[in-house]
């Protein structure tokens, strides 16, 4: 079975073309326009789906990169907080330690681990 290239002018005057894989001859111009419209719609829908998938993938990779940056920043904050906390303990042995301040490193650690967990889940979803 061979293909036939369909070239037609629409009512607005645009020149349109598409391949007709169904047959080598067309009986009427209405049939030609109908098949051309079907083919054009399929091509347009395929292109939209491809572009939507491409944008979705780009957004997912961008979110992974931003999550990596956020995770590394939180990890740096966590390390700095631990260093400050150790310095705080040495400076104020006679002072009573604030319970909220002692809880802060664990909260930061759990938040950092949650961010890294999100990164792993996103990578699994992308791949």
UniProtKB/Swiss-Prot annotation:
Any further remark recorded for this protein: Partially overlaps ORF YKL075C. Disruption phenotypes caused by deletion of this gene may also be a result of a defect in its overlapping gene.
Keyword DNA damage recorded: yes
Keywords, ordered alphabetically: DNA damage
Consequences of knocking out this gene: Leads to sensitivity the DNA-damaging agents cisplatin and oxaliplatin, but not to mitomycin C.
Name used for this protein in its record: Putative platinum sensitivity protein 1
Biological processes annotated in GO: DNA damage response
């Amino acid at each position: 079975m061979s293909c036939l290239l369909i070239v037609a002018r629409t009512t607005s005057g645009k020149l349109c073309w598409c391949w007709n894989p169904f047959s080598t001859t067309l009986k009427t111009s209405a049939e030609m326009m109908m098949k051309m419209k079907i083919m054009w719609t399929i091509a347009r829908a395929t292109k939209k789906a491809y572009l939507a998938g491409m944008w979705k993938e780009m957004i997912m990779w961008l979110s992974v990169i931003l999550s990596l940056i956020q995770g590394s920043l939180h990890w740096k904050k966590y390390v700095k907080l631990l260093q400050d906390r150790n310095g705080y303990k040495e400076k104020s042995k006679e002072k009573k330690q604030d319970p909220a301040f002692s809880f802060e490193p664990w909260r930061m650690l759990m938040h950092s681990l949650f961010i890294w967990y999100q990164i792993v889940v996103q990578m699994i979803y992308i791949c």
